[in-house]
């Protein structure tokens, strides 16, 4: 997918980031059941299906009704789609047993950015919606019209890493009571103009509204909460040898993914210090349950062809068998 920002030219539409690398890392047995947690416009799903044998299966998830409609064009008995967040995969797949791999391609897709009515981009005039699932939840405009100044500042600071969050929040709240053309912010252009006045210094090559739009999108869609829930669900669903492949587009996402994988790959580092000081064998400490298989970035050719891929980071991990234990509960040496 992609971060919020520059509009796509027609040549850049529907370009799936790290397509071959992600599918190579994900599919290790052609008869396995796989999960594409973010169908989008189906780039990864179609490539996974091409790798599967007749007994393989792919279950995709997406919040976006437009993605669900696109999934309907795939006529393959091995494929099914769930209109839900990938955070719900544990409940939705409870009767299918373990899976061979889970792919999460985070962020927002080019078609979502480029459709003005969705309200994701400051470069297109449109209603300030920002919901990935337009059938439920409140819009960004509705939230900004009712949230207090402290909450708005917190969201913009924490999710947008915006140092002018307080000034932006003050301006948003003050705008509600302005006469004439004032009142609650309703459009992308309204918000972009307000932020441009509140942000005193500008980062080179970045619109001053970039961080605020990112923050509101993350908040409205509960993206980081969904990511944490989805990682836990994926881990529980994976069979031994199963692959977890996650593509992120900004530091907040990547930090969560990195910490989650590291906690399962190097649990001894996170063990209670008192436990680490106790006279125990290394085998008696928490044992790894994931193996880190690498961190990947798009190459120069992909970035040149698709500038939105520049910030992508892909992390891959493999589920390990639980350590065998003795009758007394300690791990066998």
Curated annotation (Swiss-Prot):
It holds the Pfam family Methyltransf_5. One of its GO terms (molecular function) is rRNA (cytosine-N4-)-methyltransferase activity. GO terms for biological process: rRNA base methylation. The keyword Cytoplasm applies. Its EC number is 2.1.1.199. It is an enzyme of class 2 (transferase). It catalyses: cytidine(1402) in 16S rRNA + S-adenosyl-L-methionine = N(4)-methylcytidine(1402) in 16S rRNA + S-adenosyl-L-homocysteine + H(+). Gene3D superfamilies: Putative methyltransferase TM0872, insert domain (1.10.150.170), Vaccinia Virus protein VP39 (3.40.50.150). InterPro entries: RsmH, SAM-dep_MeTrfase_MraW_recog, SAM-dependent_MTases_sf. S-adenosyl-L-methionine binds at residues 42-44, 62, 86, 105, 112. It is found in: Cytoplasm. GO terms for cellular component: cytoplasm. Keywords: Cytoplasm, Methyltransferase, rRNA processing, S-adenosyl-L-methionine, Transferase. Specifically methylates the N4 position of cytidine in position 1402 (C1402) of 16S rRNA. Belongs to the methyltransferase superfamily. RsmH family. This is Ribosomal RNA small subunit methyltransferase H. The gene is rsmH.
């Amino acid at each position: 997918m992609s971060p919020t920002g520059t509009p796509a030219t027609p040549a850049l539409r529907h370009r799936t980031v790290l397509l071959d690398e992600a599918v190579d890392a994900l599919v290790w047995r052609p008869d396995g059941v796989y999960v594409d947690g973010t169908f989008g416009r189906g780039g990864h799903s179609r490539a996974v299906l091409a790798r599967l044998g007749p007994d393989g299966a792919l279950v995709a998830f997406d919040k976006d009704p437009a993605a669900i409609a696109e999934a309907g064009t795939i006529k393959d008995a091995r494929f099914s789609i769930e209109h839900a967040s990938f955070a719900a995969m544990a409940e939705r797949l409870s009767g299918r047993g373990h899976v061979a791999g889970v792919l999460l391609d985070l962020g927002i897709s080019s078609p979502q950015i480029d459709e003005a009515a969705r309200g994701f981009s400051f470069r297109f005039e449109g209603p300030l919606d920002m919901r990935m699932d337009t059938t439920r939840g409140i819009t960004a405009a509705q939230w900004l019209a009712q949230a207090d100044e402290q909450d708005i500042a917190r969201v913009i600071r924490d999710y947008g890493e915006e140092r002018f969050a307080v000034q932006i929040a003050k301006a948003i709240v003050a705008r509600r009571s302005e006469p004439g053309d004032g009142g609650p912010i309703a459009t992308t252009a309204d918000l972009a103009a307000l932020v441009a006045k509140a942000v005193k210094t500008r980062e080179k090559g970045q619109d001053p509204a970039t961080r605020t739009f990112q923050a509101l999108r993350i908040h409205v869609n509960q993206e980081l909460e969904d990511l944490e829930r989805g990682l836990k669900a994926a881990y529980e669903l994976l069979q031994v040898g199963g692959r977890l492949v996650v593509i992120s587009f900004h530091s907040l996402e990547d930090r969560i993914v990195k910490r989650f994988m590291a906690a399962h790959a190097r649990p001894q580092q996170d063990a209670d210090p008192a436990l680490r000081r106790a006279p125990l064998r290394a085998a008696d400490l928490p044992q790894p349950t994931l193996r880190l298989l690498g961190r990947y970035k798009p190459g120069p050719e992909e970035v040149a062809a698709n500038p939105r891929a520049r910030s992508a980071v892909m992390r891959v991990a493999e589920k390990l068998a639980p350590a065998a234990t003795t009758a007394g509960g300690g791990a066998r040496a």
